[in-house]
């Protein structure tokens, strides 16, 4: 396989693993928040506000992974170096 095929595969795996980690993190955060609201309904406003802030921070991971994948796919900072090494 050539360099560009590996770039596409790597970007795809990066997005897959980054999205998987984000989904698991968000699921655990929502689960914990719902358990907290079930135990203490009076604190639901505080719990949900804190959960939303936490979810925004977790979601930033997915955004960073997306940005890095797009840079690897389209800007491709390593293209010239790798093509020189391959060309000899």
UniProtKB/Swiss-Prot annotation:
SUPFAM superfamilies: F1F0 ATP synthase subunit C (SSF81333). One of its GO terms (molecular function) is proton-transporting ATP synthase activity, rotational mechanism. The keyword Endoplasmic reticulum does not apply. It is found in: Cell inner membrane. Its main location: membrane. The keyword Thylakoid does not apply. Signal peptide: none annotated. The chain crosses the membrane at residues 4-24, 53-73. One of its GO terms (cellular component) is proton-transporting two-sector ATPase complex, proton-transporting domain. PROSITE patterns: ATPASE_C. It is a multi-pass membrane protein. F-type ATPases have 2 components, F(1) - the catalytic core - and F(0) - the membrane proton channel. F(1) has five subunits: alpha(3), beta(3), gamma(1), delta(1), epsilon(1). F(0) has three main subunits: a(1), b(2) and c(10-14). The alpha and beta chains form an alternating ring which encloses part of the gamma chain. F(1) is attached to F(0) by a central stalk formed by the gamma and epsilon chains, while a peripheral stalk is formed by the delta and b chains. Belongs to the ATPase C chain family. NCBIfam families: ATP_synt_c. F(1)F(0) ATP synthase produces ATP from ADP in the presence of a proton or sodium gradient. F-type ATPases consist of two structural domains, F(1) containing the extramembraneous catalytic core and F(0) containing the membrane proton channel, linked together by a central stalk and a peripheral stalk. During catalysis, ATP synthesis in the catalytic domain of F(1) is coupled via a rotary mechanism of the central stalk subunits to proton translocation. This is ATP synthase subunit c 1. It comes from Syntrophotalea carbinolica (strain DSM 2380 / NBRC 103641 / GraBd1) (Pelobacter carbinolicus).
